[in-house]
Structures are given as C-alpha cells and as structure tokens.
C-alpha cells in the first residue's frame, strides 16, 4: 500500500515538475499588451492619466470636432508648397500619385474666405481692406476713425511681430493655393527611407537642445547603438529643465501622431478598379511594439498624449478670444457661420470642463532674465522646425507637416500669451492679441489630427487584442 502511495505521489510530483518546465508556454503577451502595457496611468510631468484622456476624447470630443472640421471655414487651407528648402538643395521629390496634392479651383472656395482680408469680423475685414487700399495708393484715408486706424496698425504690426513660433507662408504669394483638406487627407503615401529619415534626423539632432555626443535611440541614420546609448539618452533627457524636456516630448508626440495616421490609413489594396485604405497592424507594430522597438514605441505613444494635453490646454486658454461677439467664422454664409460658431463654442466649453488640464505655470517660472532667454530659444527652435517642412519631398506630407507645425506653434503662442488674452476687451478691436484665419484653421486641424490619433489607438488596441 505504501509503495502504491509512493508511486502516486512520485507521479504527481513528476507531472508538477513537467508543468513547471512548461511555464514559459503559458499564454504569452498579446500584441496589444506589447504596444500599450506601458501606455497607461499618469503621464510624466503631468497630473493626468491616459485613461481619462481616452474617455474624454473618444466619447465627448472627437465626434463634434470632426463635424466642425468638415465645415467650409476649416476645410480650406491656403499654403505655398513651392517654397524652396532653406537648408539643402538635393530634395528628391516623391513621384508617387499618393504624394501629390490637388489644389482647389478658385470657384470651389467660398467668396468670404477668398476675400482680401478674412482674419476678423466682416466689419473689421472691410476696414482693413480700405486701409490697405489707401496705403497702396499712398493716400491718407481720413474716413477711418483714429481708433480704427490704430487697431489696423496694431494688427499689421502683430502679424509681423517676433512672437510667432512658425515661419508662416506668404499667403498673398502667387504660389500660395487653397487646398481642400478633406480631399487631400493625411495617410500613407509611400514616402519613406533615407529622405524621410533625413527630415526627422535634422529636427531631432539640431533642434531639440541635444548635444551631438548624446545618441538618440533607434536613429536609422546612426550605427552601432546599444543599450548604453539608450540609457545615456534618457539620463540626459531627465536631467533637462522641464521646458526643454517638454520640447522634445512635443516633437516626439507629433512624430508618433503622424505615424499613427499612416498606419491607420494605409494603402492595403491598389487595383485599377479601386484603392482600399485601412488599418495596417504590421505597420503599427513595427512603429510601436515594445519588443520590436526596444521599448521606444510605448514611450512615443505617451509623448503623443503629452502633446494632446498641451494643445488641449491652449484651446481652453483661448476661449475668451472666440467668445467675443464680433468674432465669427466668416465664409459669407451667415446661417452656416452662426451654426459653426455655436458648435465651436460648445467644443471649447467642453474642453474647458476637462478636469485634469496640464499646468503650464511651471514653464519659464525661474529667474525672469533666464526665463525670457529660454523662451526665446524655445520659440526659435520651433520656428526652425517649421522651416524644415519646406524640405519634405512628398507634397502631401509637406502640406500636413506645415499645417500641424503651424497648429502646434499657434498653441504655444496662446500658452505664452495668457496675460494678453486676459486683457482683451469684451468687444471692439483687440490690440495685443489676435489669431489670423490661417492660425485658427491650423490650430483646430492640428488638434483634430491628434484627437484622431488617440481615437485610432483605441481601434488598434482592439485589433491587436487577440494577436500574439
């Protein structure tokens, strides 16, 4: 009997040991876990968590924002895609059909948008146009009141001032054309390889406050990188002041957002009958899987959420500008313009209600002289990045790169103009702070792109859930 029990116990122990030996074959991580397991909880330098952003964006904000961006005021963007690259001459233009941009015919753009000046209210537009015409004729228009003349001069001065974070296009240039953003969506174009790497390499290596001795992880144009270089990079990054660290994270977040779009609207099928665009899971994994990217992918996605919070905060700060009664989304269609302003204000008030906004008061909060110097460096670095967009060889990528950098630049301009916004009069001309139509269109479309990225992350998370 004892021998039988001994045999049975031995058998059970053996089975147990076999089970332990196969412990490695327990259900492995899903692809979703490898991409998103670290993209949760609180974000660095923030008091907000990823889950709160997902819920707020995907269910309360995203649907209404998409409706607004489909309106005439926001779908037409004037851009000069023929500006020469200011940094190098050997640009390889992408010859693929999907890289091309189809500009609008003049009769496709609403008259109110095409008018000579469309930055402000209809009344202000007329006044500015009269002033510009008088200036061209070398005459003094005495019909304009002293207050109006002062306002016009302030507006003009402000547009040419040094507080802009972007190198903006001259929209009066004959090379500047209106583009319908809905007909030229941001998606995969096939523009990749050394030419695309060069753009991002210049942005990261020369414009993110990084010394040449610090090597960026997974840089395709650098060789012989290992774990020690990665550790050195993040030790350097954590040692930066909060402003410079935020700058890097904004650029990384923008890069990540663009890669999400390209993975979500990938050319899956191209036949003479039709083109089929959709989610490319493999492409997404190559860019964001924690194992395939040696831990970089999840970091990039967290930086995307950081970028979302920065632009969300800017929109909450600029609400008073859009609430002013003389501001309108002027296209010439009064009923539609009024409806769109109501929708715009609904969205902005929803944004203002977000409970965990980024606290920008920690920015530039030290010694005033040092803070001003740092702020100017911040502005000049970002302005330089906006100029690099003219070096992108794919015209559609250039279009969306210029729009999104101008949008982020406008968000930064808002965050650094808090006192000017607070001092705006409730009605009448605003001497110190205003936004041009170009800035408004780029601001909301850029945020729309980031909002779409956050929504697409939910889609990819669901698609990857059952893949190992």
From Swiss-Prot:
One of its GO terms (biological process) is release of sequestered calcium ion into cytosol. Glycans are attached at residues 280, 384. Residues 1-23 form the signal peptide. GO terms for cellular component: dendrite; endoplasmic reticulum; endoplasmic reticulum membrane; extracellular space; Golgi lumen. Its cofactor is FAD. The keyword DNA-binding does not apply. Disulfide bonds join 35-48, 37-46, 85-391, 94-99, 94-131, 99-104, 208-241, 394-397. Coiled coil: none annotated. Keywords: Apoptosis, Cell projection, Disulfide bond, Electron transport, Endoplasmic reticulum, FAD, Flavoprotein, Glycoprotein, Golgi apparatus, Membrane, Oxidoreductase, Phosphoprotein, Redox-active center, Secreted, Signal, Transport. It comes from the Eukaryota. The keyword Heme does not apply. InterPro entries: Ero1, ERO1-like_sf. Enzyme activity is tightly regulated to prevent the accumulation of reactive oxygen species in the endoplasmic reticulum. Reversibly down-regulated by the formation of disulfide bonds between the active site Cys-94 and Cys-131, and between Cys-99 and Cys-104. Glutathione may be required to regulate its activity in the endoplasmic reticulum. Pfam families: ERO1. The Cys-94/Cys-99 and Cys-394/Cys-397 disulfide bonds constitute the redox-active center. The Cys-94/Cys-99 disulfide bond may accept electron from P4HB and funnel them to the active site disulfide Cys-394/Cys-397. The regulatory Cys-99/Cys-104 disulfide bond stabilizes the other regulatory bond Cys-94/Cys-131. The modification Phosphoserine is found at residues 106, 143, 145. GO terms for molecular function: FAD binding; oxidoreductase activity; protein-disulfide reductase activity; thiol oxidase activity. It is a peripheral membrane protein. FAD binds at residues 187, 189, 200, 252, 255, 287, 300. Predominantly monomer. May function both as a monomer and a homodimer. Interacts with PDILT. Interacts with ERP44; the interaction results in retention of ERO1A in the endoplasmic reticulum. Oxidoreductase involved in disulfide bond formation in the endoplasmic reticulum. Efficiently reoxidizes P4HB/PDI, the enzyme catalyzing protein disulfide formation, in order to allow P4HB to sustain additional rounds of disulfide formation. Following P4HB reoxidation, passes its electrons to molecular oxygen via FAD, leading to the production of reactive oxygen species (ROS) in the cell. Required for the proper folding of immunoglobulins. Plays an important role in ER stress-induced, CHOP-dependent apoptosis by activating the inositol 1,4,5-trisphosphate receptor IP3R1. Belongs to the EROs family. This is ERO1-like protein alpha. It comes from Bos taurus (Bovine). The gene is ERO1A.
């Amino acid at each position: 009997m004892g021998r039988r029990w001994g045999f049975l116990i031995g058998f059970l122990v053996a089975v147990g040991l076999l089970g332990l030996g196969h412990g490695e074959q327990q259900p492995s991580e899903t692809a979703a876990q490898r991409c998103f397991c670290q993209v949760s909880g609180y974000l660095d330098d923030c008091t907000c968590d990823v889950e709160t952003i997902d819920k707020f964006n995907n269910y309360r904000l995203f649907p209404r924002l998409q409706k607004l961006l489909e309106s005439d005021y926001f779908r037409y963007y004037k851009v000069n895609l023929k500006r020469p690259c200011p940094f190098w001459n050997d640009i390889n233009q992408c010859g693929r059909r999907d890289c091309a941009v189809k500009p609008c015919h003049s009769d496709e753009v609403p008259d109110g948008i095409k008018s000579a000046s469309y930055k402000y209210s209809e009344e202000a537009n007329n006044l500015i146009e009269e002033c510009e015409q008088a200036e061209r004729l070398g005459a003094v228009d005495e019909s304009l009141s002293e207050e109006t003349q002062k306002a016009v001069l302030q507006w003009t001065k402000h547009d040419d001032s040094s507080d802009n974070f972007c190198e903006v296009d001259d929209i009066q240039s004959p090379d500047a054309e209106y583009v319908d953003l809905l007909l030229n969506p941001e998606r995969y174009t096939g523009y990749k390889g050394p030419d695309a790497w060069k753009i991002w390499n210049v942005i990261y290596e020369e414009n993110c406050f990084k010394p040449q001795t610090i090597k960026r992880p997974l840089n395709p144009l650098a060789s012989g990188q290992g774990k020690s270089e990665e550790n050195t990079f993040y030790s350097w990054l954590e040692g930066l002041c909060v402003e410079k660290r935020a700058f890097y994270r904004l650029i990384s977040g923008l890069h990540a957002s663009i890669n999400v779009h390209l993975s979500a609207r990938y050319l899956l099928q191209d036949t003479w009958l039709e083109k089929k665009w959709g989610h490319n899971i493999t492409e997404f994994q190559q860019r964001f899987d924690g194992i395939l990217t040696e831990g970089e992918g999840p970091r990039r996605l967290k930086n995307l959420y950081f970028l979302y919070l920065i632009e969300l905060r800017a929109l909450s700060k600029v609400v008073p500008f859009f609430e002013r009664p003389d501001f309108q989304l002027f296209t010439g269609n009064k009923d539609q313009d009024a409806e769109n302003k109501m929708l715009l204000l609904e969205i902005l008030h929803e944004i203002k209600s977000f409970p965990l906004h980024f606290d920008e008061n920690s920015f530039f909060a030290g010694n005033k002289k040092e803070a001003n110097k740092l702020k100017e460096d911040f502005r000049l670095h970002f302005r330089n990045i906006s100029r690099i967009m003219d070096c992108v060889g794919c015209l559609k990528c250039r279009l969306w790169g210029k729009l999104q950098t101008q949008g982020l630049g406008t968000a930064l301009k808002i965050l650094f103009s808090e006192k000017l916004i607070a001092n705006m009069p409730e009605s009448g001309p605003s001497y110190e702070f205003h936004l041009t139509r170009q800035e408004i269109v780029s601001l909301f479309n850029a945020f729309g792109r980031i909002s779409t990225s956050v929504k697409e992350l939910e889609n990819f998370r669901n698609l990857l859930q059952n893949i190992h």
